[in-house]
Amino acid sequence: MSRRNRAPKRDILPDPKYKSQVVAKFVNHIMLSGKKSIAEKIVYGAFDKIKAKDASANEVEVFEKALESVSPMVEVKSRRVGGATYQVPVEVRPERRQTLGMRWIIDAARKRKENTMGDRVAAEILEAVEGRGAAVKKREDTHKMAEANKAFAHFRW
């Protein structure tokens, strides 16, 4: 770990189509090997499919609702105390909540069986809004783990 000062947070420019920073972050998370135009096609294609499913809904609001239903409130962190390693439940900061939610939606989408990545992302977002899907299950598992280790909550740092 660097002993220098922490690098300053960079502001992310909102995406060109929806003017949303959250969507821009999602595009950046989907991007592989610096291919942003492909990542944008995937995300915008997924949003078009969401819009096609429910014409009255705003696709960005649907995405934000899905992100909210996937983002964890608590997680466990390992802490060594006297030779034993405890899984200590800690509250998740808002920025990390958003990042974890996006990461879990993308991981779940990559494991799905639909043809294109756009289809997978759209299906995972729609399932997350309904409270189903692999990303929501990941959140439930994280919360269960934190609940099971609640006894070690006094080991906070």
UniProtKB/Swiss-Prot annotation:
One of its GO terms (biological process) is translation. It comes from the Bacteria. InterPro entries: Ribosomal_uS7, Ribosomal_uS7_bac/org-type, Ribosomal_uS7_CS, Ribosomal_uS7_dom, Ribosomal_uS7_dom_sf. Keywords: Ribonucleoprotein, Ribosomal protein, RNA-binding, rRNA-binding, tRNA-binding. Gene3D superfamilies: Ribosomal protein S7 domain. GO terms for cellular component: small ribosomal subunit. Pfam families: Ribosomal_S7. One of its GO terms (molecular function) is structural constituent of ribosome. PANTHER family: RIBOSOMAL PROTEIN S7. NCBIfam families: rpsG_bact. Part of the 30S ribosomal subunit. Contacts proteins S9 and S11. One of the primary rRNA binding proteins, it binds directly to 16S rRNA where it nucleates assembly of the head domain of the 30S subunit. Is located at the subunit interface close to the decoding center, probably blocks exit of the E-site tRNA. HAMAP family: Ribosomal_uS7_B. Belongs to the universal ribosomal protein uS7 family. This is Small ribosomal subunit protein uS7.
